[in-house]
């Protein structure tokens, strides 16, 4: 962790620098900051996940995950056709965290069918933010269970997939689960649900 020359941290948490926290910089820190700002792949080297067997550890990206990250940074709109459980949500959390750290006034909205799911995804981002070296992240203005606001004006919030989700809000990046339409053969009723829930009813 970078040594702060002023002991100012959000709620006393040493992993949450306040906007006025200053650091004693060295050449390696300056180089890492610049490289992380320019390259999401370099930034991802500092991104931590929780491995079920080994606990907290830096993520090790597969080549296809690197390609997705590059596509996210190179293109405004992206559609990813992929199987389940290959780390798509993790990739989106890396992208969201990178953007709010290095873009001013950038707004991310995490959408899921249930609030608990959105909160769980946001917990991953909170963990990754806390595990970043302090010199890589803007200071914290607000740090809550359902949202994060940084000193550079960027923020992340959560929402459920309701008909009026985020209505009237200005959002730069929206991430969410894939939703499919399924017709019940017996009743004829049409259901909309996340892909991950389809397997549960088959």
Positions of the model-derived regions?
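Phosphate/NTP-binding elements of NTP-utilizing enzymes
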Residues: 2-176, 182-201
């Amino acid at each position: 962790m970078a040594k702060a020359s002023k002991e100012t941290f959000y709620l006393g948490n040493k992993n949450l620098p306040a906007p006025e926290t200053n650091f004693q910089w060295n050449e390696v820190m300056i180089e890492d900051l610049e490289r992380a700002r320019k390259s999401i792949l370099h930034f991802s080297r500092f991104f931590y996940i929780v491995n079920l067997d080994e606990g907290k550890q830096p993520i090790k990206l597969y080549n296809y995950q690197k390609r997705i990250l590059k596509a996210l940074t190179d293109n405004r709109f992206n559609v990813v056709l992929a199987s389940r459980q290959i780390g798509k949500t993790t990739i989106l959390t890396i992208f969201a965290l990178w953007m709010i750290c290095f873009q001013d006034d950038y707004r991310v909205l995490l959408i899921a069918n249930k609030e608990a799911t959105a909160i769980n995804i946001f917990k991953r981002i909170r963990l990754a933010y806390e595990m970043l070296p302090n010199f890589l992240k803007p200071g914290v203005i607000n740090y809550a269970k359902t949202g994060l606001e940084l000193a550079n004006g960027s923020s992340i919030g959560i929402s459920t997939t309701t008909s009026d989700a985020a209505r009237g809000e200005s959002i730069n990046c929206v991430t969410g689960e894939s939703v499919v339409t399924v017709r019940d053969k017996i009743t004829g009723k049409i259901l909309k649900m996340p892909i991950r829930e389809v397997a549960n009813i088959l």
